[in-house]
Amino acid sequence: GLVKMILEKKMSMDEYRNTSILYRTNKEAVQVSDLLITEKIPFWCTEPIQDKYDHWIYRDILSYHKLGIGIGNKMDLNRILNHPQRFLFDPRFFKTDGSLKQLMHVAATLPDGKWKRSKAMDSVEDMFYLFKKLEDKSPVDTLQILESFGRYKIFLHDYAEYRNMSPGELYFFWNSYKADAEKHNDWKEWDAYVRKHKIILQEQLRKHDGIALSTLHRSKGLEWDRVYILNCVKNTIPFAKQGTVEDLEEERRLFYVGCTRAKKELQLLSYQGNSGEISPFIKELKSSESDTGDKVDLDVHLKY
């Protein structure tokens, strides 16, 4: 992985300061910063980074936990009502007191035909059975139940496809939460860890020292001896919204801006497990040595 590559170099603090990790969009900084925090590698960023625990997937997990132990409120229920997809879209579902009785009443009085009413009632019953299974479960057991019986990871895949995202972007959060949950015996321990994680991230960013994290855009005017550019795959570099690249020339220019930030070494990488095509810009770059400077060592890693 990327962090392993960095650790193997056994960098000094000065070498950290002369290293940058670049990416197309700021959301990619969440994963990178978490990996660096885990390995206690110093870093800073050219713009704010969202903590991985400030994500809707973690809020879903907390809502399921609270509903499982009987302290969930209406907001918790509404948040996870269709996570995974239960097709409970009637506005009346979101106006109940959250009880099984009221939700079943809404399901039984849907105007969409008998089979849809029956399916909605089954979905409500299954949801409350899931809450029962989560009662008094540890963090890791909760996630395992949500993944298996709750079909939550399948939901993440379907959600990503619907949003034209790589499922790996959401799997990162889920798998990271699972890994953290395995290290904590109860919810109090995990909550303390979450709070500490947020503090560590903010303290690290305030120090403004170590490896620089930056979007390609924010890297303009800066230079480092060693530069890593992440996720060099089609639809990320160049960046595509809903599968469409709005300005190919601007995307190409941004990529070359990132490449020319390297004074000595340039590493181009893509996500581990990403099945996407390698960025077309890489072929262009490799065909013209002068694009990155004659003295820059260019290396392409297909995975990190």
What are these regions (language model features)?
Residues 1-71, 211, 222-224, 230:
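Conserved motor-region signature of P-loop NTPase helicases/translocases
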Residues 29, 55-58, 74, 90, ...:
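Amphipathic alpha-helical transducer elements in NTP-driven molecular machines
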Residues 55-56, 71-72, 137, 164-168, ...:
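Structural motif
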Residues 59-81, 213, 243-246, 260-261:
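Conserved RecA-like P-loop NTPase helicase motor core
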Residues 75-107, 113-116:
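Helix-hairpin-helix
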Residues 90-92, 103-106, 222-225, 237-240:
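Extended hydrophobic-aromatic, low-complexity segments
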Residues 111-218, 239, 265-267, 282, ...:
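Accessory C-terminal helicase-associated subdomains
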Residues 226, 233-304:
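Accessory/regulatory regions of helicases
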